[in-house]
Amino acid sequence: MILMKDIVRDGDPVLRQVAQKLTFPLSDHYRKLADDMMEYLVNSQDPKIAAKHQLRAGVGLAAPQVGEGVSMAALLVPDDKGEIIFKEVYVNPEIISESVRKTCLSEGEGCLSVDKVIDGYVPRPNKVTVHYWTVDGEEKAIRLKGYPAIVSGHEIDHLNGHLFYDRINKENPFALDEDTIVIY
């Protein structure tokens, strides 16, 4: 089981490297990694399990965040009532199209690999199309909007060596285009 001690923290070089593409069929090691990353997300969103194991809640976890420099990310995205609206493990994902219109979370973003609060809006495309493979090697493309699009962008950024705060406007962290959708 992945615990907080297993999460690589900001400053580790693996977080700034472009992740290596995986080939199919996935090895048992990478299939287990996918399962373990999803298990962390499920456990972290369960208040009792999270408290017992001192897990910080997460909606996404990329392989580099657990020290594996490969292109894989688990996503478990709830709605505002806690119901899961998107659950998937991406292998070799890429955003193949995105909207011009941006969106962001009203409270900014956080990251399991970043221990401090970094204030500022993180503008991302409101709609994205993600092309990826499943753990079983099935090729897919999915169109996402709003919060699932934000989470997908955050995790795919990890696979490209970027952290959320790289997207914050350094001059004015709370500046937004006037048509940006703010999710509360």
Swiss-Prot record:
The keyword Nuclease does not apply. Binds 1 Fe(2+) ion. Fe cation binds at C111, H154, H158. It comes from the Bacteria. Its cofactor is Fe(2+). Removes the formyl group from the N-terminal Met of newly synthesized proteins. Requires at least a dipeptide for an efficient rate of reaction. N-terminal L-methionine is a prerequisite for activity but the enzyme has broad specificity at other positions. Belongs to the polypeptide deformylase family. This is Peptide deformylase. It comes from Lactobacillus delbrueckii subsp. bulgaricus (strain ATCC BAA-365 / Lb-18). The lineage of its organism: Bacteria, Bacillati, Bacillota, Bacilli, Lactobacillales. The gene is def.
